[in-house]
Curated annotation (Swiss-Prot):
The gene is Chst12. Belongs to the sulfotransferase 2 family. Keywords: Carbohydrate metabolism, Glycoprotein, Golgi apparatus, Membrane, Signal-anchor, Transferase, Transmembrane, Transmembrane helix. 3'-phosphoadenylyl sulfate binds at residues 176-182, 250-258. It is a single-pass type II membrane protein. It is found in: Golgi apparatus membrane. Residues 78-87 have a biased composition (Basic and acidic residues). This is Carbohydrate sulfotransferase 12. Its EC number is 2.8.2.5.
Length: 419
């Protein structure tokens, strides 16, 4: 064999070996390195790593952290570029002494304990809510679909309610009809994901409603696959371990009443065509219906609350499509048995919980939660709304939403479930 051929052979073999080494390295980064990070504790219970012996590990940890930080920070960079954002506020360096970079920082955020000015009674209430949630997730007596699956079993499209703020290390699972418009506004301010004439919004109430519910405004978990491919689940787990996760819930029956009022008692073209027309045909025996919601309302054609309950209980409804997010169960939106939430807020105590959460996140000096809407649906209205609903339907409806009642500590509405 001539020398040129030998040279080409060695070149091919060397290139193949190099490619193999690169593949092995990235596979290791995607597994062992990421699981090293996911083993870290939550932000509010972090303990300092020992400072002795860190010198020998610095090369390894800095390599891992550089790769992880690059992935984590690419979220914000992608959003910034897509909105033609030219400046990013500098992140202050942590003032605390010598702790591992891996332990202390995700994109430079200070993960010290969030306990400033906390109210012991409200802290106790939070602990009770979270404990109740964990206990029933582990309790075999409460059974509901999806309870026993793992986080990896959740389809990507079911993670679309988890909004991520990388600047402050926050994940919010939004539940429609539970103050989600204002919490989305808060997340926009914190993440600086939307600009107003070149500058990030500072006041949540300044953000137009049409932008708040635009899916392109928020970074959600279901978008990770397109950005990170095989690393997406690993990265989600890193953030779920490191970030503060919260959600707000509401009495399930009151939430249904609120959804009905806003989507079917007010003129809503989208919900009329997609939901009201089929309901009126199936449950109110209307065969010829106007093309627009305004014409239907003028003719006195409206979905009744009983029609809405029939729709929810009809076994054929979800054979066609999953429940709309406005009446889908919270356990299906936010996966509370797969995600260990750090804060569980309730609409019934919204003002107090919002203030406590902003202190917990250490952002209470930056913004205030917008004032709550005082004309919202009240729990005292339940008996009036369900007065004309047959008892058997009420009992079936409770079974449909029982998991939400139990997991989040809402009492069983006995007055509605018996004659």
């Amino acid at each position: 064999m001539t020398k040129p051929r030998l040279f080409r052979l060695w070149l091919v073999l060397g290139s193949a070996l190099m490619i193999l080494l690169i593949i092995v390295y990235w596979d290791n980064v995607g597994t062992a390195h990421f699981y090293l990070h996911t083993s870290l504790s939550r932000p509010h219970i972090l303990e300092p790593l020992p400072t002795q012996g860190l010198v020998e590990e610095n090369v390894f940890t800095s390599d891992v952290d550089e790769f992880l930080d690059t992935l984590l920070s690419s979220d914000a960079k992608h959003n910034d570029l897509s909105r033609r954002k030219t400046e990013q506020p500098p992140v202050p360096a942590p003032s605390k002494p010598v702790l591992s970079h891996m332990e202390e920082n995700v994109r430079g955020y200070d993960w010290s304990t969030h306990d400033a000015h906390q109210n012991p009674d409200r802290d106790r209430q939070q602990a009770e809510r979270r404990s109740l949630l964990r206990d029933f997730c582990a309790n075999a007596s409460l059974a509901f679909p999806t309870k026993d699956r793992s986080f990896d079993d959740i389809p990507n499209y079911e993670l679309n309610h988890l909004i991520v703020d990388d600047r402050h290390g926050v994940i919010y699972c939004y539940v429609p009809k539970v103050a989600c418009t204002n919490w989305k506004r808060v997340m926009i301010v914190l993440s600086e994901s939307l600009l107003d004439r070149g500058s990030p919004y500072r006041d949540p109430l300044d953000i137009p409603r049409e932008h708040v519910h635009n899916t392109s405004t928020h970074l959600t978990f279901n978008k990770f696959w397109r950005r990170y491919g095989k690393f997406s689940r690993h990265l989600m787990k890193v953030k779920l371990k490191k970030y503060t996760k919260f959600l707000f819930v509401r009495d399930p029956f009151v939430r249904l009443i609120s959804a009905f009022r806003s989507k079917f008692e007010l003129e809503n073209e989208e919900f009329y065509r997609k939901f009201a027309v089929p309901m009126l045909r199936l449950y109110a025996n209307h065969t010829s219906l106007p093309a627009s919601v305004s014409e239907a309302f003028s003719a006195g054609l409206k979905v009744s609350f009983a029609n809405f309950i029939q729709y929810l209980l009809d076994p054929h409804t979800e054979k066609l499509a999953p429940f709309n997010e406005h009446w889908r169960q919270v356990y299906r939106l936010c996966h509370p048995c797969q995600i260990d939430y750090d804060f569980v807020g309730k609409l019934e105590t919204l003002d107090e919980d919002a203030a406590q959460l902003l202190r917990f996140l250490k952002v209470d000096s930056q913004l205030h939660f917008p004032p709550s809407y005082r004309n919202r649906t009240a729990s005292s209205w339940e008996e009036d709304w369900f007065a004309n609903i047959p008892l058997a339907w009420r009992q079936q409806l409770y079974k449909l939403y029982e998991a939400d009642f139990v997991l989040f500590g809402y009492p069983k509405p006995e007055n509605l479930l018996r004659d």
